Swiss-Prot record:
The UniProt record lists the keyword Cell division: no
Descriptive protein name: Putative protein FRMPD2-like
Domain of life: Eukaryota
Gene (UniProt): FRMPD2B
Signal peptide start and end residues: none
Species of origin: Homo sapiens (Human)
Record key words, sorted: Repeat
Listed SUPFAM superfamilies: PDZ domain-like
Gene3D superfamilies assigned to the protein according to its UniProt record, in alphabetical order: 2.30.42.10
PDZ domain mapped to chain residues: 1-46, 90-178
Length: 320
């Protein structure tokens, strides 16, 4: 019957959810949620003095009566709403070359405490395909039956074979859950336990997210590895600097015998001295040949100061 709750009434059920065994906090949460109308089952105690014909078997001072009440309440959480309370409807689809044009997921009952069994939900509608063109199907709808066969109790592979093995025309019995009864498809399942489908989705996302990182790492290795650095001529440039700086020191000090018999690398102390002045200059092979084998007029005049019988003079004339 429909009535108004009175103080002292005992609340037994909210929209079919039995409150027996729930804590006070859980019971309060059941009275909050997105729904505007809720069905309550109350237990009302009727004092014995108000009864006209008391029962002979009544040993208690009052009588308890179950009262069914439909009343408007503020929003309630999804845990207190039956997911199959939404409107049920049938949709007929004809397969094309790509099938029915939608994907589905199986939401295990362990993922949500208020589910009585696994649910098969439509995850995505593909543009231009039969399911999307039908216009009556939406992501998140629950598939209750396929061509009259219930999906309750079926595992994911069985539902898949049921849809793939269906004839050209398929009749789907769908149910659209009340708002807030189940997580939105875009948000996946916000539950502490992972369903089989979510584990598969997470594995797929991990593969797709790590692949670009591997590609970037490979390209980084190709462009910035130590081997590649050597290939860019980093070490030859340092040796060229040493040659330039050693030759510059030779022109300043002119120890002729030692400069012609020793390699430029034998003067490491000259590198530091010349680094600030000649850092931007690149020594070419021609410049090295000129510096090693040719001398200026000043060098010749400087040679005149020495005796022509000296070894340095003989060595210089041999070079010229």
């Amino acid at each position: 019957m429909t009535s108004i709750p009175f103080p002292g009434d005992r609340l037994l059920q909210v929209d079919g959810v039995i409150l027996c065994g729930l804590t006070h906090k859980q019971a309060v949460q059941c009275l909050k949620g997105p729904g505007q109308v809720a069905r309550l089952v109350l237990e009302r105690r009727v004092p014995r003095s108000t009864q006209q014909c008391p029962s002979a078997n009544d040993s208690m001072g009052d009588e308890r009566t179950a009262v069914s009440l439909v009343t408007a309440l503020p929003g309630r959480p999804s845990s207190c709403v039956s997911v199959t309370d939404g409107p049920k409807f049938e949709v007929k689809l004809k397969k094309n070359a790509n099938g029915l044009g939608f994907s589905f997921v199986q939401m295990e009952k362990e993922s949500c405490s208020h589910l009585k069994s696994d649910l098969v939900r439509i995850k995505r509608l593909f543009p231009g395909q039969p399911a999307e063109e039908n216009g009556a199907i939406a992501a998140g709808d629950i598939i209750l039956a396929v061509n009259g066969r219930s999906t309750e109790g079926l595992i994911f592979q069985e539902v898949l074979h049921l849809l793939r093995g269906a004839p050209q025309e398929v009749t789907l019995l769908l149910c659209r859950p009340p708002p807030g009864a189940l997580p939105e498809m875009e948000q996946e399942w916000q539950t502490p336990e992972l369903s089989a489908d979510k584990e598969f989705t997470r594995a797929t996302c991990t593969d797709s997210c790590t692949s670009p990182i591997l590609d970037q790492e490979d390209s980084w290795r190709d462009s910035a590895s130590p081997d590649a650095g050597e290939g860019l001529g980093l070490r030859p440039e340092s040796s060229q600097k040493a040659i330039r700086e050693a030759q510059w020191g030779q022109n300043r000090e002119r120890p002729w015998a030692s400069s012609l018999t020793h390699s430029p690398e034998s003067h490491p102390h000259l590198c530091k001295l010349h680094q600030e002045r000649d850092e931007s200059t690149l020594a070419t092979s021609l410049e090295k040949d000129v510096r090693q084998n040719c001398y200026s007029v000043c060098d010749i005049m400087r040679l005149g100061r020495y005796s022509f019988s000296s070894p340095l003079t003989r060595l210089s004339t041999d070079i010229f």
